[in-house]
Amino acid sequence: MAVGSAAALICDTGALLDYLVESAPDHRLFRSAIDQARTRYVPGLVLAELDYFLRAERRAMERFMRDLARGAFTYAPPTLDQLSRAIAIDRRYSDLGLGLVDGSLVALAESLGLRRVATRDVRHLAAVRLRDGSPLELVVHPTDPDKS
């Protein structure tokens, strides 16, 4: 699993939660990894999930939305083709319970020709293969990776 570098990066929900919430156990590590990326993509479904999880951290979400609006992150809403692909990916990995959000993240990676994903979700995303058979390059620093 990689440490951050200047290459483009797709951000998953858990990574952004740790990036935004200063009291998170891995805040500094995810902040460093994400800040090093040249381009930081936020998938549309990740943004919705992030908003839900940050209900109690509204200031953090507001700061993030300002950063997103000024272009510090690249918002990447799913296309209909990407949603169809996300559903197919979720179906293919049904034994993992991957879900639409993670499926859309993989579909975005395929569409952009990227492999680097900042995530805490090692269990799900380490098992996934892109359409060409290659694995994602997970940029992780979790003290306690998601068990979901």
Where are the language model's segments positioned?
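Short, well-structured N-terminal submotif of metal-dependent ribonuclease cores
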Residues: 1-42, 54-65, 145-147
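Alpha-helix/helix-capping structural signal
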Residues: 14-15, 45, 81, 123
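Active-site neighborhoods of divalent-metal-dependent phosphate/nucleic-acid chemistry enzymes
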Residues: 3-4, 75-120
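Acidic, PIN/NYN-like endoribonuclease modules and their adjacent C-terminal/linker elements
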Residues: 1-4, 106, 113-148
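Short, hinge-like loop/turn segments at secondary-structure boundaries
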Residues: 57-61, 94, 133-137
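Helix-adjacent hinge/juxtasegments
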Residues: 55-56, 62-80
